Curated annotation (Swiss-Prot):
Pfam families: Amidase. The active site is at 79 (charge relay system), 154 (charge relay system), 178 (acyl-ester intermediate). GO terms for biological process: translation. Its EC number is 6.3.5.7. This is Glutamyl-tRNA(Gln) amidotransferase subunit A.
Length: 485
């Protein structure tokens, strides 16, 4: 039995009783990485020397009997688009291959203050643009459940590392499903918080009105502990919300009697794998037995979500990525004859194909002749999508459906057709456009591959999302299943 089969609260108890040391936990993480990393390839950069030094320092504090919190001394993996002072941050793209940040993201400051230990930085799609982690500029991460399949994306390294037992939990980011989709593919728990619940300061921006940092864990309770540590208003991020952060762990009562669930008919219709559909219906039956009721509803503008998202996200990416020019940091071409040449060649050599595709799409949507027809119209449709959610939430507590239309697909299966790749996020994207919280929890298997159940909540009501997810988790054992590597 691995130490990481224990929950956060169990590990905390073991540390308090001195049955294990923090150094033991760090050793276990690097031991497991040494055992499976060649197969999974989740990490881009390891932080071994600093992690072991911090473990020794925290062990000394523990020996003195100092008061500690639940995350104290626990190893964590960090998606490589969250800046870490003194630890290389690449966003999995060539143009930032040597970027060494001089400050920590706010979430890193909060994790460090809580005593968490950064094990390393995790692979992803370049600048978080992708649904399979195949767009990484450095390596291909594989799904621990089937090494011939993708782990999902863009937080594929984070989900794969947790599923493979390399770390007990990890941070990811979610712009259109990039936490929830890989969590579903890898059979772990992933939450996208409400937009503004977690500071984005220090998150390398893809689409600023959609991006949100969130936790990927083995269990719902662990997820709640991690969100508790990173949530809250931040003066360094003007979009972070000054909304009180409740005690998420206290919300895990297991009681969902009288809960009203909405199930959008758009989420179980055409394009959803039959095995996935049956897994979700079985999950709803479990929730019914626990005292909840569910009804079918409609989110009529969902069919426009994919087009709306790719216009808005690509437009924001076009603006955000203009700063990567080879002047101040990162890669700079050696082949330039003049300044303009340097800009062009640095970006063409430093960006991958998917990043270039989205910059082109965004620049086109923002151009003077097409701004009203594309970008402005997409913003109007986004408002309609948000209203759909608001209307449903007037009558129901949560919305439930599958996280993804299918289980994990094979490596290389969708790379030649970007539209089929984009369509894999069709059930997660509306949540980002509306800015509401959503979690993916394991709810079954299709041909030995995990299936995710998506539970969507009202703005800043992560507590109810967690309560429902935890009640379902405790009534099933899908979260206890582990891949064999």
């Amino acid at each position: 039995m691995s130490l990481f089969d224990h929950s956060v609260s169990e590990l905390h108890t073991l540390l308090q009783k001195k049955e294990v040391s923090i150094s033991d936990l760090v050793d276990e993480s690097y031991r497991r990485i040494g055992e499976v990393e060649e197969k999974v390839q989740a990490f881009l950069t390891l932080n071994e020397e600093q992690a072991r030094a911090k473990a020794k320092e925290l062990d000394d504090q523990l020996a003195k009997g100092e008061e500690t919190n639940p995350l104290f001394g626990l190893p964590i993996g960090i998606k490589d688009n969250i800046v870490t002072k003194g630890l290389r941050t690449t966003c999995a793209i060539k143009i930032l291959y040597n970027f060494d940040p001089i400050y920590d993201a706010t979430v890193m400051e909060r994790l460090n203050a809580a005593g968490a230990i950064t094990i390393g930085k995790l692979n992803m799609d370049e600048f978080a643009m992708g649904s399979s982690t195949e767009n990484s500029g450095f390596q291909l991460t594989r799904n621990p459940w089937d090494l011939k399949r993708v782990p999902g994306g863009s937080s594929g390294g984070s989900a794969a590392a947790v599923a493979a037992g390399e770390v007990p939990f990890a941070l990811g980011s979610d712009t259109g499903g990039s936490i929830r989709q890989p969590a579903a593919f890898c059979g772990v728990v992933g939450l996208k918080p409400t937009y503004g619940r977690v500071s984005r300061f220090g998150l390398v921006a893809f689409a600023s009105s959609l991006d949100q940092i969130g936790p990927i864990t083995r269990t719902v309770e662990d997820n709640a502990y991690l969100l508790q540590a990173i949530a809250g208003v931040d003066p360094m991020d003007s979009t972070s919300a000054n909304v009180p952060v409740p005690n998420y762990v206290e919300a895990l009562t297991g009681d969902i009697k009288g809960l009203k669930i909405a199930v959008p008919n758009e989420y179980l219709g055409e394009g959803v794998d039959e095995g996935v559909r049956q897994s979700v219906l079985a999950a709803l039956a479990v929730l019914e037995k626990l005292g909840a009721t569910w009804e079918e509803v409609s989110l009529p503008h969902s069919k426009y979500a994919l087009a709306t998202y790719y216009l808005l996200a690509s437009s924001e990416a076009s603006a955000n990525l203009a700063r990567f020019d080879g002047v101040r940091y990162g890669y700079r071409t050696d082949n330039a004859k003049n300044l303009i040449d340097m800009y062009k060649l640095t970006r063409s050599e430093g960006f991958g194909a998917e990043v270039k595709r989205r910059i082109m799409l965004g620049t086109f949507a923002l151009s003077s002749g097409y701004y009203d027809a594309y970008y402005k119209k997409a913003q109007k449709v986004r408002t309609l999508i948000k209203r759909d959610f608001e209307n449903v939430f007037e009558r129901y507590d949560v919305i439930i459906g599958p996280t993804t239309p299918t289980p994990a697909f094979k490596i290389g299966e969708k790379t030649s057709d970007p539209l089929t790749m984009y369509a894999n996020d069709i059930l997660t994207i509306p949540v980002n456009l509306a800015g509401v919280p959503a979690i993916s929890v394991p709810c079954g298997f299709v041909d030995g591959l995990p299936v995710g159940l998506q539970i969507i909540g009202k703005h800043f009501d992560e507590s109810t999302v967690y309560r429902v997810a935890h009640a379902f988790e405790q009534a099933t054992d899908y979260h206890k299943q582990k891949p064999v590597l």
